[in-house]
Swiss-Prot record:
Sodium-dependent lysophosphatidylcholine (LPC) symporter, which plays an essential role for blood-brain barrier formation and function. Specifically expressed in endothelium of the blood-brain barrier of micro-vessels and transports LPC into the brain. Transport of LPC is essential because it constitutes the major mechanism by which docosahexaenoic acid (DHA), an omega-3 fatty acid that is essential for normal brain growth and cognitive function, enters the brain. Transports LPC carrying long-chain fatty acids such LPC oleate and LPC palmitate with a minimum acyl chain length of 14 carbons. This is Sodium-dependent lysophosphatidylcholine symporter 1-A. It is a multi-pass membrane protein. It is found in: Cell membrane; Endoplasmic reticulum membrane. Glycans are attached at residues 214, 220, 229. GO terms for cellular component: endoplasmic reticulum membrane; plasma membrane. GO terms for biological process: carbohydrate transport; establishment of blood-brain barrier; fatty acid transport; lipid transport across blood-brain barrier; lysophospholipid translocation; lysophospholipid transport; maintenance of blood-brain barrier; transcytosis. Expressed in the developing nervous system. Disulfide bonds join 212-464. One of its GO terms (molecular function) is fatty acid transmembrane transporter activity. It catalyses: a 1-acyl-sn-glycero-3-phosphocholine(in) + Na(+)(in) = a 1-acyl-sn-glycero-3-phosphocholine(out) + Na(+)(out); 1-(4Z,7Z,10Z,13Z,16Z,19Z-docosahexaenoyl)-sn-glycero-3-phosphocholine(in) + Na(+)(in) = 1-(4Z,7Z,10Z,13Z,16Z,19Z-docosahexaenoyl)-sn-glycero-3-phosphocholine(out) + Na(+)(out); 1-(9Z-octadecenoyl)-sn-glycero-3-phosphocholine(in) + Na(+)(in) = 1-(9Z-octadecenoyl)-sn-glycero-3-phosphocholine(out) + Na(+)(out); 1-hexadecanoyl-sn-glycero-3-phosphocholine(in) + Na(+)(in) = 1-hexadecanoyl-sn-glycero-3-phosphocholine(out) + Na(+)(out). Residues 71-81, 135-144, 209-232, 325-335, 381-383, 458-469 are extracellular.
Length: 532
């Protein structure tokens, strides 16, 4: 679609007909100060909103980095069963997103808003299920069903939290600049949440390092006391210690989850933005879904970030195993993961400045491709702890961009949709839930396929050293596959039509519409006095 297309439809259908509206005239519009103050968000509101995003990232990081290795080395499941749990759990999680999005779109407005009740009700059951994911049940035959059940339950309840929270971006302010600022706050806290998740899970579990069996000497009677990185690990006692460590870490994360949800609920006021656009009318979910999925910029944005997200998910899901076995840093893998997340957190403000200065599309190209040389470097050089830390710092910068940019660009697509479909409203949850659906489905595919690939390569549970075929598979999973997916995603992104000029134009038209609606409301209030 050509730049600005759809503006004529918008202006002729909803704006006053007494004066024509051109792009140049719109640029001169100055909103009243009272209206600007109404839409302004305080720093406190932005911080509280941002804190609400931490639980999803804290739990997601812990699951993404550590669940695979927990199922394989602590719960002692075979790789095939672990791959089934990871794939089915993530696939189920993906299916729940459009379902919850539909239910949220049908939720009536309450005194707490439309999104907040979902966030409040889902919190406590979610943390209970999360804790039980990290418990090793005393039954051997039912282990797989135990993890599959509580993993799926947690993902469902987490969706009931995250989809309304994501859509809340459109209900905290009608001002695009305010939403972008709140999104930057949110991304900073969310990436900091990944640091917290990595630190809590990694450092607590790292105190009870995973025991392993000496697979090079199967007839050696000292297998229960093996040497790993110059330290002796008693096998049975350490398995028990590590199980306790995982439960302690999950309990701490569960407590943080509850605190963050409470801060969000009491610190953010959800605005009834839909009431401000009286000219709009609600359409059915099915029609809304067809409109959303038929909106070209949204489809292109989702497809592009689907492939780039899949690349980083492959890296995330396999990097701990890669560090532990291929690089041989059994006692350092949690610290290397922590460095990646700290680097990503520090880079978020820089990327926010960059996208404001050079535009969002440029930020995508630079930010996502930044990681590619380091993905290649980490599998090309000989195993070196110093090189691993350098690569981790550099890769974290790209991870920060991957966190910020999709959520910063989705509101632009929603605004563009509103201008091209001015009589349709209430589809924010559909936009966000289907984006999360596709990324979560990609995550399930990446974890399931990668764990299955390790099974075919001959991965052995609990051993100190894996075979060459396993190490080669891990190199492909953290380097060649992600690089190829990033290239494909960026090729699709080249067709994304919303540049900075179109984004600003859309924003000014929306503000003009809201201004006229508010003026009409004021006239309605004054009308009885005038006629009297």
């Amino acid at each position: 679609m050509a730049r600005g297309e759809g503006a004529e439809q918008f202006s002729s259908g909803l704006l006053p007909t007494a004066k024509s509206v051109t792009q140049n005239e719109i640029k001169m519009v100055k909103l009243p100060k009272q209206q600007e103050r109404k839409r302004a968000l305080t720093v406190w509101s932005k911080v509280c909103f941002a804190i609400g995003g931490a639980p999803y990232q804290i739990t997601g990081t812990a699951l993404g980095f550590f669940l695979q290795i927990f199922l394989l080395d602590v719960a002692q499941l075979n790789p095939l069963n672990a791959s089934v749990i990871l794939f089915v759990g993530r696939a189920w999680d993906a299916v729940t997103d459009p379902t919850v999005g539909f239910l949220v779109s049908r939720t009536p407005w309450t005194r707490h808003g439309r999104m907040m009740p979902w966030i409040l009700v889902s919190t406590i059951p979610a943390v209970l299920c999360y804790f039980l994911i990290w418990v090793v049940p005393p039954i051997e035959q039912g282990k797989m069903m135990w993890y599959l059940l509580f993993y799926c339950l947690f993902q469902t309840l987490q969706t009931c939290f995250h989809v309304p929270y994501s859509a809340l971006t459109m209900f905290i302010s009608t001002e695009q600049r305010e939403r972008d600022s709140a999104t930057a706050y949110r991304m900073t806290v969310e990436v900091f949440g990944t640091v917290v998740g990595t630190a809590i899970q990694g450092q607590i579990v790292g105190m009870a390092n995973t025991p392993c069996k000496n697979n090079t000497s199967p007839n050696n009677s000292s297998n229960d006391l093996i040497q790993s990185n110059n330290s002796h690990i008693p096998l049975k006692s350490n398995i028990f210690d590590e199980r306790c460590a995982y439960m302690i870490a999950s309990a701490v994360i569960s407590l943080i989850y509850v605190v963050c949800a409470a801060v969000l609920f009491f610190g953010v006021r959800e605005q009834d933005v839909q009431g401000e656009l009286k000219a709009q009318k609600r359409v059915s979910f099915q029609k809304g879904l067809r409109l959303v999925m038929g909106h070209g910029p949204y489809v292109k944005l989702v497809l592009a970030f689907l492939f780039t997200s899949l690349a980083f998910m492959l890296l995330e899901g396999n990097f701990a195993v890669f560090i532990k076995y291929t690089l041989g840093f059994r006692e350092d893998f949690q610290n290397i993961l922590l460095v990646i997340m700290v680097s990503a957190t520090v880079s978020i403000p820089m990327w926010q400045w960059f996208l404001c200065r050079f535009g969002k599309k440029t930020a995508v190209y630079i930010g996502i491709t930044w990681a590619v040389p380091f993905m290649i470097l980490v599998v090309s050089v000989n195993s070196s702890l110093i090189v691993s830390y350098i690569v981790s710092i550099a890769a974290g910068v790209s991870v920060g961009a991957a966190f910020l940019l999709p959520w910063s660009m989705l509101p632009d697509v929603v605004d563009d949709f509103k201008l091209q479909n001015p009589t349709s409203q209430g589809h924010e949850a559909i936009f966000y839930s289907f984006y999360v659906f596709f990324t979560k489905f990609a995550s399930g595919v990446s974890l399931g396929v990668s764990t299955l690939a390790l099974s075919f390569a001959g991965y052995e549970t609990g051993v100190c050293v894996q075979s060459d075929s396993v190490n080669l598979t891990l190199k492909l999973l953290v380097s060649a596959a992600p690089v190829s997916l990033i290239a494909l995603g960026l090729l699709i992104f080249m067709t994304y039509p919303i540049d900075e000029e179109r984004r600003e134009y859309n924003n000014k038209q929306l503000q003009l519409l809201l201004r006229n609606e508010e003026e009409e409301d004021e006239m309605e209030v004054l009308k009885p006095d005038i006629t009297a």
